[in-house]
Curated annotation (Swiss-Prot):
Other information: There are 73 peroxidase genes in A.thaliana.
Gene3D superfamilies in the record: 1.10.520.10, Peroxidase, domain 2
Main location group: secreted
Location of Pyrrolidone carboxylic acid modifications: Q32
Species this chain originates from: Arabidopsis thaliana (Mouse-ear cress)
Annotated residues for binding of Ca(2+) 1: D74, V77, G79, D81, S83
Binding site for heme b: H200
UniProt catalytic activity: 2 a phenolic donor + H2O2 = 2 a phenolic radical donor + 2 H2O
Keywords: Calcium, Disulfide bond, Glycoprotein, Heme, Hydrogen peroxide, Iron, Metal-binding, Oxidoreductase, Peroxidase, Pyrrolidone carboxylic acid, Secreted, Signal, Vacuole
Cofactor comment: Binds 1 heme b (iron(II)-protoporphyrin IX) group per subunit.
Name of the top EC class for this enzyme: oxidoreductase
Site entry (Transition state stabilizer), positions: R69
The protein's role, per its UniProt record: Removal of H(2)O(2), oxidation of toxic reductants, biosynthesis and degradation of lignin, suberization, auxin catabolism, response to environmental stresses such as wounding, pathogen attack and oxidative stress. These functions might be dependent on each isozyme/isoform in each plant tissue.
Protein's recorded name: Peroxidase 54
């Protein structure tokens, strides 16, 4: 991965103000999260997470997008409680089996490596749900994006919610209205839809996530008319009709491994890879269009909005206090063993918007 040094555009005043504002928006449970939660019990937690991801990036350039996607998929189902990380057991149906996650989510091995390192340094202290939040921030800043103060203190859930994963996660094939409704259902707004979609500024997508646009869009017998003709030709070569759909390409064509605002300038030239990406700009009259234009012309504005949206998303229904537990192994509830051996799954797309209807 072409990692650049992080050049945060959010000054200290902005971050401090943002933490105060967001904490006040999400009630008592979220207000219990704070930036210094581990200062006395595991002061090097953030550094350990960052170091482990730096090592992972040496062999896997797309791991940053994958880790953010895990955090997104976790928070949208049952709140940010680490439930996505749980394997099948005799009493738990894993969220990994949902169409939006199966053959799609990846990076579990890196989460396990982070957990092992943290357990070695400070046993039984840092939750798996906090690992996902810290890993997301580290992934963004290591790719040249903004850095922010992560609010901590989440505890891990005791069960998974497969039916919730089946119904709550957005799909790259969905229309903008449906996707926005799913964001609103967890307390997010239109600006959050656009800013969090901006995480597609790095990562990869597999043919199956966008081949619906290449030959027979919405049953018309023609390609998606909002897809740039030059991009269309190259994608048709990568993903031929009736092919295996296993080809992989960059979500951001211009700077695929850097966290920047080029994702939005790509949308302005009809170079969004996924249907759900391009609809943010091509859906005439949508409230998302001026937001895309603003982020395309002002990277600082995008970075600030992205930080705010990540903090808001990380505050979705966390378990705090004595609720839940601190898992010893992110794959299983304490005292249980998994029914399946956890492992990485073949990537289909990185970033917040999920793969559904596989």
């Amino acid at each position: 991965m072409a990692v650049t040094s992080s050049s945060s555009t959010c000054d200290g005043f902005f971050i401090i103000s943002l933490i105060v504002i967001v904490s006040s928006l999400f009630g008592t449970s979220s207000a219990q999260l704070n930036a210094t939660f581990y200062s006395g019990t595991c002061p090097n937690a953030s550094a350990i997470v960052r170091s482990t991801i730096q090592q992972a990036l040496q062999s896997d350039a797309r791991i940053g997008g994958s880790l953010i996607r895990l955090h997104f998929h976790d928070c949208f189902v049952n709140g940010c409680d680490g439930s996505l990380l749980l394997d099948d057991t005799s009493s738990i149906q894993s969220e990994k089996n949902a169409p939006a996650n199966a053959n799609s989510t990846r990076g579990f091995n890196v989460v396990d490596s982070i957990k092992t390192a943290l357990e070695n340094a400070c046993p039984g202290i840092v939750s798996c749900s906090d690992i996902l939040a810290l890993a997301s921030e580290a992934s963004v800043s290591l790719a040249g994006g903004p850095s922010w103060t992560v609010l901590l203190g989440r505890r891990d859930g005791l069960t998974a919610n497969l039916s919730g994963a089946n119904s709550s996660l957005p799909s790259p094939f969905e229309g903008l209205n449906n996707i926005t409704s799913k964001f609103v259902a967890v307390g997010l707004k239109t600006t959050d839809v656009v800013s969090l979609s901006g995480a597609h500024t790095f990562g990869r997508g597999q043919c199956v996530t966008f081949n619906n646009r290449l030959f027979n869009f919405n049953g018309t017998g023609n390609p998606d008319p909002t897809l740039n003709s030059t991009l269309l030709s190259s994608l048709q070569q990568l993903c031929p009709q009736n092919g295996s759909n296993t080809g992989i390409t960059n979500l951001d064509l211009s700077t695929p491994d850097a966290f920047d605002n080029n994702y939005f300038t790509n949308l302005q030239s009809n170079n969004g890879l996924l249907q759900s990406d391009q609809e943010l700009f091509s859906n005439t009259g949508s409230a998302t269009v001026p937001i895309v234009n603003s982020f395309a012309s002002n990277q600082t504005l995008f970075f600030e909005a992205f930080v705010q949206s990540m903090i808001k998303m990380g505050n979705i229904s966390p378990l705090t206090g004595s609720s839940g537990e601190i898992r010893q192994d992110c794959k299983v509830v304490n005292g249980q063993s998994s029914a399946t051996e956890a492992g990485d799954i073949q990537l289909q797309s990185d970033g917040p918007v999920s793969v559904a209807d596989m």
